[in-house]
Amino acid sequence: MSTRQEILRATERLIRRKGLSRVTTKQIAQEVGFAEGTLFNHFRDKSDLFGAVLVENLPPLMEISTSDRAGQGTVGANLREIALAAIKFFDKVVPLAASVFADIELRTQHRAALRRSKGGPHHLFEHLAKYVAAEQSLGRIQPQVDPLGVAVLLLAPCFHWVFIKRANGQNLFKITDAEFVNLTVRTLEHAIRSEIRKLS
């Protein structure tokens, strides 16, 4: 594990244990066992570090939704796998993001950092849209379907599902994540087929 990854994991542990507002760079350095200055060899400032923690698990999720998997398995199975991975990602990120967004200064700095890096959560939607477009090129999804629309209709419910569970502290719907994903993907597939019939 690289030094940067060790710092990110230590920061995440502390945020979950103490809350973001109570975490200092000195505490992070002590947690990971490095000099405090080491943190700033890898991150511009505290907000840059916290922002990196937010997107730490995004690359694996991006890999699952890559266009390279087009043509493998079934489209429905692929969308289910992507949705389950998204739920796991959102479940980890939502509490951290809530802490950042609740702090005006950190939120402003985080947004500035995203603009500098040209990063942001929209890339996840774009990545999934590319997968859908790749399936269209193989004839496995009809060309009338809007790729970005599919991405939004799959990922947005996953985020809201996690948000509701986190906000209430329990699963009020009494179904598992997998059952929710099956319900969402089946509904999405039905909606797509209906729209195709309407356009044809």
Regions found by a protein language model. Give the residues of each.
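Short, structured helix-loop boundary elements
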Residues: 4-5, 25, 47, 72, ...
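Helix-turn-helix
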Residues: 6, 14-48, 52-56
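Short amphipathic alpha-helical elements of helix-turn-helix/winged-helix folds
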Residues: 10-14, 52, 85, 157
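Amphipathic alpha-helical linker/stalk segments
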Residues: 54-82
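C-terminal peripheral helix-coil segments that are non-catalytic and often amphipathic
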Residues: 77, 81, 88, 122, ...
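Short secondary-structure transition hinges
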Residues: 88-127
